[in-house]
Amino acid sequence: MTTDAPKLAISITYCTQCNWMLRSAWMAQELLSTFSLELGSVTLIPGTGGIFEISFGDELVWERKRDGGFPDSRVLKQMVRD
């Protein structure tokens, strides 16, 4: 019997008022295409007030206001690898 390591759950919270759903969905697609076997889930969570946050489990790894905009897909993928 083999034991599988727990798979990473990623959540992307985006602002619906800012029309960032497509950006969020594209990032989710990029992650799922690259890490299809390593990820447990990628969840899109609608929000308001200019929010754009990416969390790995309970850890906030990207926040638009704090980190200055949106992550490049290359940067986001490197964060998953690390």
Where in the sequence are the language-model features?
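Domain-level signature for proteins that mediate thiol-based redox and metal-cofactor handling
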Residues: 1-82
